[in-house]
Amino acid sequence: MKLISWNIDSLNAALTSDSARAKLSQEVLQTLVAENADIIAIQETKLSAKGPTKKHVEILEELFPGYENTWRSSQEPARKGYAGTMFLYKKELTPTISFPEIGAPSTMDLEGRIITLEFDAFFVTQVYTPNAGDGLKRLEERQVWDAKYAEYLAELDKEKPVLATGDYNVAHNEIDLANPASNRRSPGFTDEERAGFTNLLATGFTDTFRHVHGDVPERYTWWAQRSKTSKINNTGWRIDYWLTSNRIADKVTKSDMIDSGARQDHTPIVLEIDL
């Protein structure tokens, strides 16, 4: 089975805009088409509460014929056109779909951050983890989120093995970002967020990239758009993950990044597993 995850940073822009950045996103989408994955998880869709428009659906069906889609968008009183997730999956797959709420603080449960697909023998779940925010203003809420999310995955894992993916908004260890020393109190590399991810893994999950590749350095999934040279210089962060229940980690045959060319921000990640 092949699965892909990508924080797209606006599905609407990627599908309908003709800006230079959107064209780069469209090139990445063509790369994903060629990958012919069974399941594609997409984060930060930024769609309205009504979800994809008719035009969005038409373009998706043109790009990905033979795929169903399911989505969850941010709902009031949460911010409009914010966060949001989507799955594309091949039509021969017939998952049971759920949109879990985990008892998160503030409006986090209404921001469209988690979708779970249940199959006979396993779960596939994606997450767009809340950012701790400028000035770490959301860090306390983020810590609650991390604990609640870990509990949620552990509950799934009691039923059957889990494949979990998404933008976790944390570089777990120093090897997972280019400049750890200068980012100690940056969102995504605070001690608190790193401890939250350690706790998540400790509930019974494996970071599949490290499982496959060991301590290979300078491999990242995100490069800041604010710096024009972040990708050229590879000053990146690894904040997107494919996790599996420990008991199926040895079934993973590939866990890697997909090249997204000159496009900064997130790059897609791929998992291949014998299930």
UniProtKB/Swiss-Prot annotation:
Its cofactor is Mg(2+); Mn(2+). The keyword Cytoplasm applies. Keywords: Cytoplasm, Exonuclease, Hydrolase, Magnesium, Metal-binding, Nuclease. Pfam families: Exo_endo_phos (PF03372). Mg(2+) 1 binds at residues 9, 44, 265. The active site is at residues 128, 167. Mg(2+) 2 binds at residues 167, 169. The record marks 266 as: Interaction with DNA substrate. It catalyses: Exonucleolytic cleavage in the 3'- to 5'-direction to yield nucleoside 5'-phosphates. SUPFAM superfamilies: DNase I-like. Its EC number is 3.1.11.2. It is found in: Cytoplasm. One of its GO terms (molecular function) is metal ion binding. InterPro entries: AP_endonuc_1, AP_endonuclease_F1_BS, AP_endonuclease_F1_CS, Endo/exonu/phosph_ase_sf, Endo/exonuclease/phosphatase. The record marks 169 as: Transition state stabilizer. GO terms for biological process: base-excision repair. The record marks 240 as: Important for catalytic activity. Probably binds two magnesium or manganese ions per subunit. Belongs to the DNA repair enzymes AP/ExoA family. In addition to 3'- to 5'-exonuclease and 3'-phosphatase activities, ExoA was shown to make single-strand breaks at apurinic sites in DNA. This is Exodeoxyribonuclease. It comes from Streptococcus pneumoniae serotype 4 (strain ATCC BAA-334 / TIGR4).
